[in-house]
Amino acid sequence: MRNKYCILILLTVLSLSWKQKNNMKSNERIVYALDVTIPGRYEAYINDILVETNNEMSMHNTIININQAVLKSGTYQFRIKLFSSNEELRKGGIQPDTFQFLKVGLVKYQKIAVGEGAEEGTYQYLYSYPIPNLEKPVPYYEIKGKFTIDLPYELNGWSNGQDLRKWDKDTLKKKVIAYYKKLWEILNKGDVDQWQKLVKKSQEEIAFFNYSDKEYLNKYIKEEKEEIIKDKGMMAALEDYEMKIYADGRLVCLERSNHTKQVNGIDWDIKGESPLIQYGKEGGAATFPVKLYLPQ
């Protein structure tokens, strides 16, 4: 079990809110995404936020949701970083012929009412980003692009957060680590009521941009509570992390800093994942991706 979207938590006041556009239509469930084919390991950033990381050296054909990293309509940027395998590095890096498989496109669709996916006949391929022709191997490569979107809603989210880049780095890191330790203790105790107090508003915003109804949200919350209680006392040690700042200084988090081959009996490289990891009593693990911000 892995959480799909990142939970946003304040370091101080624990509240979030959203505001709808006056012209929002009840039947609009517009999703923007990057439709990608990526050969090898990669990290995907949208609006200066790491939204997806995959450490498997294989061919990835996937959709990267844009809605999760933006708060309203506008023009934004993305970047996708491709990394060499150890074998490729011995040959100088990513080989030029590998780039023939790399594809990145902007898509838009109307989400189905229940679950994930596009309503039939609504999937639009808006733009295909150019891929370079390289003449020699490179240790890594980064493709960047811009896109403009028009969403039927507007969220407050982290928009009023402080620019944490202006903080003393050591002071900020101590504060962030202390807060993660607090979250770790809550999860390890199986204190689902306290956890819900912290994440309720963020879960509501996730449900909102994902066009999920209250029934779906309540079902998700119920299942998460059951998982936390079932694996009470099974939190992995809070270790091997580094602090990362995103969203032009508005968001901060801890991420695992080293590669792994296995986690609690399953093949899983957790570099870049949240260090809040709960082991399953019957094997496997769940991460709790959290980003923090401080209101101005």
Name what the model sees in each region:
Residues M1-Y5:
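Positively charged n-region of N-terminal signal peptides that target proteins for export
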Residues E88-Y125:
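Exposed low-complexity, polar/acidic, P/S/T/G-rich flexible segments that act as propeptides
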Residues Q196-R250:
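Short solvent-exposed beta->alpha transition segments
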Residues C6, L10-S26:
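Bacterial Sec-dependent signal peptides at the C-terminal "C-region" and cleavage site
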Residues S26-R29, T37-F101:
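Beta-strand-rich ligand-recognition modules
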Residues E120-D168:
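Juxtamembrane and targeting peptides
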Residues L172-G190:
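Short, aromatic-enriched amphipathic alpha-helices that serve as compact interaction elements
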Residues D231-Q296:
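Exposed beta-sheet edge and beta->alpha loop/turn motif
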